[in-house]
Amino acid sequence: MARKFYVDQDECIACESCVEIAPGAFAMDPEIEKAYVKDVEGASQEEVEEAMDTCPVQCIHWEDE
């Protein structure tokens, strides 16, 4: 079972870095212009961690932290 994570959409600035790094896990919502998690199993933990580290506003978080 994949470790769950989420995007804090209040903080997201729609830079799309997470989508570029892990397109299987993240997508952009065109209506609100924010990133969201489309599939928690769509990327490896390493890819998710890279997306977290690359996010300029640090709005991607593990659900259990």
Curated annotation (Swiss-Prot):
Binds 1 [4Fe-4S] cluster. Keywords: 4Fe-4S, Electron transport, Iron, Iron-sulfur, Metal-binding, Transport. PROSITE patterns: 4FE4S_FER_2. Residues 3-31 form the 4Fe-4S ferredoxin-type domain. Its cofactor is [4Fe-4S] cluster. GO terms for molecular function: 4 iron, 4 sulfur cluster binding; electron transfer activity; iron ion binding. InterPro entries: 3Fe4S_ferredoxin (IPR001080), 4Fe4S_Fe-S-bd (IPR017896), ET_Ferredoxin (IPR052395). The keyword Transferase does not apply. The keyword Electron transport applies. [4Fe-4S] cluster binds at C12, C15, C18, C55. Signal peptide: none annotated. Ferredoxins are iron-sulfur proteins that transfer electrons in a wide variety of metabolic reactions. Homodimer. This is Ferredoxin-1. The gene is fd1.
